[in-house]
From Swiss-Prot:
Encoding gene per record: purC
Secretion signal, residue range per the UniProt entry: none
Pathway: Purine metabolism; IMP biosynthesis via de novo pathway; 5-amino-1-(5-phospho-D-ribosyl)imidazole-4-carboxamide from 5-amino-1-(5-phospho-D-ribosyl)imidazole-4-carboxylate: step 1/2
Name of the protein in question: Phosphoribosylaminoimidazole-succinocarboxamide synthase
Family to which this protein belongs: Belongs to the SAICAR synthetase family.
A GO CC annotation given for this chain: cytoplasm
One Pfam family matching this protein: SAICAR_synt
Alphabetized PANTHER family for the sequence: PHOSPHORIBOSYLAMINOIMIDAZOLE-SUCCINOCARBOXAMIDE SYNTHASE
Keywords carried by this UniProt record: ATP-binding, Ligase, Nucleotide-binding, Purine biosynthesis
Organism (species): Syntrophobacter fumaroxidans (strain DSM 10017 / MPOB)
Length: 301
C-alpha cells in the first residue's frame, strides 16, 4: 500500500482479488460481494493528480453513507455494511486501513451509463447552452444566465469511459437502446426523484446542489443505486449564501482544483502537475465543509 493508514494513495491487500483500480476507488472481489475502498487520490479532467488529498477517502465514504441512509425510501442501494467488524473474515487483517474509507457492498450488474441530473446551468452545461441554446440536446428557454436554476431538473446521461478516457454525452434514446426502454425510463425517474429530495435537504443545510451524477445497476433483478452518492467528487455544491445568478460561485467540490489547473496553464494531459500544499489543503477544507454542512458531523462525529 502506498502511504500510511492516514494517507492512502493506493491499496494492496494480499489474499484479496483486486477487481478494478479507478480514479479514486480500489475495488476487490469477495466472491458474491465487493469491497470498495475510497483512497485519497483526486482526479481532474479525467487525469489522476500525483499527490493525494488527506482524509479525502474518509470524507467521501462518510458522505456516501449519509446519503444512502437518507435516500433509502426512494431507491434501494448496494450497501451491506461500512462496519469493518462485519466484513468477511479475509478483510480483517486490513481493518486499520479499511476503517472509515471502505464499504462492503452487494454485487450489481452496473449499467454502462452515468446518470447525470442538472438543476442549474453550470460547467459544461452552461458552455453547451451558450453555443446552442441546448444542454445535451435538450432545448431550454432563451436568455438564461450562468448558474441560473433551470425550470425543472434535466436528465443528461453519458457514457462511462475507461480510466484516462472522457465520458461522452448520449441521448436518452441511446441509453434506452443500451439498457432497454422501460429500464431507462425507470432509471431516469429515480434519478430525478433522488435529486429533488437531496437538493431540497441540501438547501436547508445552506448548500445548492447544482448538478450531480449517479450510477445504477441490477441486484437480483431490482434497480439499485451503486457507487458513490452526492459527494464533492460527483456533484457541484454551491454555498447558498454566496449564490448569485450570472456567475459561478465558489464551491465545496472539485471546481476549486479545476480552476487552479486552468490558471496554471496545464494542458489537461499527462503528466499532471504536482499540486502545491495550499491547493491540497484548500481542497480538503472544501470537502470537509461539505460533509459537515450536509451531515451535521465531521470525520470524528
Amino acid at each position: 500500500m502506498s502511504g500510511s493508514p492516514d494517507l492512502v494513495l493506493e491499496t494492496d491487500f494480499p489474499g484479496l482479488k483486486l477487481l478494478n483500480r479507478g480514479k479514486v476507488r480500489d475495488i476487490y472481489d469477495l466472491g458474491d460481494s465487493l469491497l470498495i475502498v475510497a483512497t485519497d487520490r483526486i482526479s481532474a479532467f479525467d487525469v489522476i493528480m500525483p499527490n493525494p488529498v488527506p482524509d479525502k477517502g474518509r470524507i467521501l465514504t462518510r458522505i456516501t453513507e449519509f446519503w444512502l441512509r437518507f435516500l433509502s425510501d426512494v431507491t434501494e442501494n448496494h450497501l451491506i455494511s461500512s462496519d469493518v467488524s462485519r466484513y468477511p473474515e479475509q478483510c480483517r487483517p486490513y481493518e486499520r486501513v479499511l476503517a472509515g474509507r471502505s464499504m462492503w457492498v452487494k454485487k450489481a450488474r452496473v449499467f454502462p451509463v452515468e446518470c447525470i441530473v442538472r438543476g442549474y446551468l453550470a460547467g459544461s452545461g452552461w458552455e453547451d447552452y451558450r453555443k446552442t441554446g441546448q444542454v445535451c440536446g435538450i432545448a431550454l428557454p432563451a436568455g438564461l444566465q450562468e448558474a441560473q436554476q433551470l425550470p425543472e431538473p434535466i436528465f443528461t446521461p453519458s457514457t462511462k469511459a475507461t480510466l484516462g478516457e472522457h465520458d461522452e454525452n448520449i441521448s436518452f434514446d441511446a441509453m434506452a437502446a443500451a439498457i432497454g426502454e422501460e429500464m431507462a425510463q425507470g432509471v431516469r425517474d429515480v434519478t430525478i426523484k433522488v435529486y429533488l429530495k437531496a437538493s431540497s435537504y441540501a438547501r436547508q443545510r445552506g448548500i445548492i446542489l447544482a448538478d450531480t451524477k449517479f450510477e445504477f445497476g441490477l441486484v437480483e433483478g431490482r434497480l439499485t443505486l451503486v457507487d458513490e452518492v452526492l459527494t464533492p467528487d460527483s456533484s457541484r455544491f454551491w454555498p447558498a449564501d454566496r449564490y448569485r445568478v450570472g456567475s459561478s460561485p465558489e464551491s465545496f467540490d472539485k471546481q476549486y482544483l479545476r480552476d487552479y489547473l486552468v490558471r496554471s496553464g496545464w494542458k489537461k494531459t499527462d503528466p499532471p502537475p504536482v499540486l502545491p500544499p495550499d491547493v491540497v489543503e484548500n481542497t480538503r477544507k472544501r470537502y470537509l465543509e461539505a460533509l459537515e454542512r450536509l451531515s451535521g458531523h465531521g470525520l470524528e462525529g
